[in-house]
Amino acid sequence: MVRLREIPRTATFAWSPGPTQPLIATGTKAGAVDADFSNDTQLELWELKLDDAEQGVELQPVATVSVDSRFNDIAWSQPSEQHPRGIIAGALDSGALVLWDAEKLRTGASDAQIDQIDKHTGPIQAIQFNPFRPNILASAGAKGELFVHDLDDESKSFRLGKAGANPDEYTTLDWNKKVAHILATGSSGGFVTVWDVKGKKENLTLNHFGRKTVSAVSWDPDVPTRLVTAIPTDQNPLVLAHDQGVLSLSWCPQDSDILLSCGKDNRTIAWNPHSGEQLGRISGRDKLDLPDQIQPVEPEPYSRPASFDGKIAVQTLQNTGANADQSKTAKQAPEGEDFFAQTHAEPQGASFSLKSPPKWLKRRAGVAFGFGGKLVRFGVVDAKSKITISTFAVDSDISQASEDFDKALETGDLTSILESKISKAATDEEKADWTVIETLTSDNPRTKLVEYLGFADQSEEAPAEVKKEAQTNGDADEGSSFFDNATDEGNFLSDLAARKGAKTNNPFQVYTGSESEADTKITRALMLGNFDAALDVCLKENRLSDAFMIAICGGEKCVAKAQAAYFKRQSDAPNYLRLLASVVGKNLWDFVYNADLKDWKEVMATICTFADQAEFPDLCEALGDRLEEAIAEGTTSYRKDASFCYLAGSKLEKVVVNWAQELQENENAGLEQSETDNSFSIHARSLQDFIEKVTVFRKVTQFKDTEQSKENDWKLEPLYAKYVEYADIASAHGQLAIAEKYLDLLPQKYPAADVARNRVKQATRKGAAPAAAGQRQSQPAAAQRGQRVVPAYGAPAPQPTPAQRTASPYAPANPLAPAQTNSPYAPVNPLSQQAQQATQQPPARAGGAYTPAGYQPAPVQQGYGGYGQQQQAPLAPPPQNFSNPNGPSIVPAANRGHIPAWNDTPDFGPPKTASRRGTPLNAVASPFPNQQQNYGPPGGASPGFPPQSRPTPPPPPKGPPQGPPRMTSPPSQAGGAPPNAPNPYAPSPAANNYAPPPSGFAPPQQAPVQRGASPYQPPQSAAPPSNRYAPAPGSQPSAPSGMGGMPPPRNIAPPPGQFTPGASAYAPSPYAQSPAQQAPAAVAPPPRGPPQGPPRAGPPPGGPPQGGPPRPESRPGTGQSQPAAPAAARYPPGDREHIPMVSRPIYEILGAEIQRVKAKAPAQYKAHVTDTEKRLNILFDHLNNEDLLKPDTIQQMNELASNIQAKQFDEAIAIFQDLMTNKNDEGSNWLVSDVITFDADVGVKRLIQFSKSTPA
């Protein structure tokens, strides 16, 4: 409890009601003596000024009125129209009841006193206003006098009870807080009486105290039949925890679970009256406390009762810290004083804070929006707290429209949809679009398109036959045809004989002698059937009519030649010949590109009539593009026409751009015209029309998106953006299935859909069955985690019992051996500073599927050379399930959906501690006592599996192995692989961008141990590490390069109590830290084949036989003595839902920036931008898992992202350089490149460079 204010008075008091600034009215207490022995009696007002920081603790009165008698009680009524601050009533010791107007009293008006009522014949002990009717005031006092006053009309006041019937004095009273006409009183005779004021009668009398005075009575604020009483008797104070009598009670009107009691033992105690729990207490140094009160409007401050030391303290119920005087310790009493006098100087402080918030701080009701259109509400229903989840729609019309459209699509009745849309179209452009789409549903769309353009095939009526007058004498009319007067019988052709033996009376000569040379050539060519030559002569002589007749006989080739020659000669011919030339030559592109745009309908009709089916879409697109170019020049009326061409050619990627512009225009028009709808509703409806149009068009044309697998440069990107927006609106209205349907139409690599797609999938994901969940809970945690690490590509290997060893063959002999291995799975530098802080990174499969995260496989070696093999108990060989070397490769576990939790971190049960048999100490030259030299491989190696260089595991225990096997191996090739055989899982050294830097980055080294050259060993690329636990050289036979071994187990920290290895399971890199800082070892894979040569040294007698994984054993003298904590659960790579809010600006700003750069970067930088994006995804994965990055690093990254967003690249570079200098251990994968051969930095640095170079 915190003391807020103090009033230096020994007085009775009352709080001001109402929402105004709190005031306290005090009246000099009857029977109390001031420190100055003053006889003055005053009514004073005090303003707390809790919002004034300059106000001191001790207050000064704002108004003072002198009274002729002292006060026993004060009451303050609710505000009213006549009295805006209420009425203050004073119960005087003289028996007078005085009323003041609080507002006039505060302003110092002379007429502040309203009235004085003198009905009591003795002192008035208690008064109180009715909480429901502020004009009703009850007063009780000596001689059993109890009056109910109507301040509006004093003539209606009356007395309860008969005069002389109760000689006791009323000491306290309280109105019921639920029933307006119920009043309770307490008397000096020990009686508690419940009165029915409406009936003016006594309802109930209680007496459980004998003749003990009732000091306080208070009704429960919530329950109308419950009240609490107290007596001031020291022998039985009734309210427990008080050592002496209780003087007053105050039940909080806002929270019935808080009750204050004040006693003569100088303590104020807070209670929960319903549970009987004591919430806390305040102990004071005061001699005697008087009644306390909780403020009726804002219960947090309450008045600690006035005491006879002359103070009224205003305190809070909740403690926020000790006061300055409470923090002081008691000072040593001066010499000669009473030792026990120190106790009076002990600080008295608050001894509690409320365990639960009071009701006025609790939320009685609350509401929150949830994803998927969910509205979560909680509140009190039928006296119980209830949570309700309902679906909320911002605009019910929008959700109803989307549902109706989705149902119509499911029925497949597109005709009814089209008819409805055409009839409801608001603009001509929209109606034209739907009409064109409707024409595409017909059996012959081209014919319908021609009809829509207004070029229906209407055969002209034959002209009426004109009767010609017979010509008389004279020649025929000039220009008349020779055949005009001919009859059918006189037809020249009909006179020719058509059958064998027929003779006519019209003989002719083949050559008359008057023929020209051309005629002769033509005749000769026709006789010989050489139509091509005859055609050439006709064309040369410009006899086009004869040429066409001959071409008809000569076939298509001749016809084409005649047509070409004809059109060539008609340069000044009518325009229809240009059209005819395009049609005949099947070259409609000339007509499309060169025809005047005002005749676009004619061009479109020609395309629909003559275009080849394969060229038709492209011709329509070309015509639409010409119309679009005209729009760009300012002729906007062509947009509808261009959309028609795109629709006819099924070019969705082109028409969707026009529809998007139309969408924006419709939205702007709706905002101008509508007076009731909000902008969201108008936008959502316009978007709904857009989506319906696109969806129906795709259904009608059976459109197939061929760019689903592309990573960028999508033609339909404007449509994808609308799909994402529509999915968000559908999700907000609870239509998750509809949202998911449209999100599935987007490419998987479309970045803007990642968040929406993940949220929808999580919201629609079904939970596990209750039975399965219960079964999982019943399993031990270790068993559950152990089962997850068993891969599906092979059965678990049998778990043999390791034999007891006689000597320790596991200690390395050479402290300076470099860490190189020929195994494509053995990672290099697993325990560098970067790797130690990133042990929980997700695997980065740059090359092999089994490459552990954070490690780069070493370059393929030609042999083991001088790098020795630590002798140990090997793992059991994998099951003999060999596959054809040329057969299909093993499907990675990441691509197998049926493997449950395949990527979870393994866990192992607690090991049994094996007793270590004492071994004699050997005299050795090694710097480590009792260290045995390394030998060759154990004699019991499985045939067909070459030995693999691997680090030293801890020695096995003597007992049987515990827990499930750590890892089983995949099926290997029968008989082993030939020398130099490529390993399908081993990445090449240059294929991994995450390889550690070569020797140029190595820290200062110790001098390496000189050793003989090995025919199998390549030259060293760096100095050996200064690690005394590195494996010894020259103790392992060589193996051919490219021989793959089992994938190593994931480098994880074991659970507590697992084991304490003495050295790393992987050979340390040249820049590894000391063994005391290295992570716990993991078991190395088993050998994969026989040795490729004689061993340098035979195995020691009694060496460990072949068996299962060696069990760890506690060994003193190593740097690691405490087991590491189990690895925390990680989210899958690419998940961005768990990025905390403090890190989300980094993801949002950098992600948006890389997408901007990616869209505008030149093609030659595509690979660099892609690599930068991959590095940033590593950063985002760490942010999502809340690992690796420290809070100060995240803060710096936020500043860096803000600088990039603000185009302040110099500041961003400065922050980046600081991170590279001081935080390189946290950002080696995403800040810059680890491979020097690339000769370029990537990650954040390259993003800054790209952003600086890419225009906005």
UniProtKB/Swiss-Prot annotation:
Membrane topology: Peripheral membrane protein
InterPro entries: SEC31-like, WD40/YVTN_repeat-like_dom_sf, WD40_repeat_dom_sf, WD40_rpt
Domain of life, per lineage: Eukaryota
Biased amino acid composition, Low complexity: 765-809, 833-862, 969-978, 1023-1041, 1061-1082, 1123-1132
SUPFAM superfamilies: WD40 repeat-like
Alphabetic keyword roster: Cytoplasmic vesicle, Endoplasmic reticulum, ER-Golgi transport, Membrane, Protein transport, Repeat, Transport, WD repeat
Cellular compartments annotated: Cytoplasmic vesicle, COPII-coated vesicle membrane; Endoplasmic reticulum membrane
Sample GO molecular function, one term: structural molecule activity
Segments annotated as WD repeats: 7-47, 66-110, 119-159, 165-205, 209-241, 242-281, 368-390
GO biological process, any: protein transport
Gene3D superfamilies (alphabetical): 1.25.40.1030, Functional domain of the splicing factor Prp18, YVTN repeat-like/Quinoprotein amine dehydrogenase
Regions annotated as coiled coil: none
Biased amino acid composition, Pro residues: 944-968, 1046-1058, 1083-1111
GO cellular component: COPII vesicle coat; endoplasmic reticulum exit site; endoplasmic reticulum membrane
Chain positions covered by the region annotation Disordered: 460-481, 761-1139
Family to which the UniProt record says this protein belongs: Belongs to the WD repeat SEC31 family.
The protein's role, per its UniProt record: Component of the coat protein complex II (COPII) which promotes the formation of transport vesicles from the endoplasmic reticulum (ER). The coat has two main functions, the physical deformation of the endoplasmic reticulum membrane into vesicles and the selection of cargo molecules.
Subunit organization: The COPII coat is composed of at least 5 proteins: the SEC23/24 complex, the SEC13/31 complex, and the protein SAR1. SEC13 and SEC31 make a 2:2 tetramer that forms the edge element of the COPII outer coat. The tetramer self-assembles in multiple copies to form the complete polyhedral cage. Interacts (via WD 7) with SEC13.
Name the UniProt record assigns to this protein: Protein transport protein SEC31
Organism the protein comes from: Phaeosphaeria nodorum (strain SN15 / ATCC MYA-4574 / FGSC 10173)
Classification of source organism: Eukaryota, Fungi, Dikarya, Ascomycota, Pezizomycotina
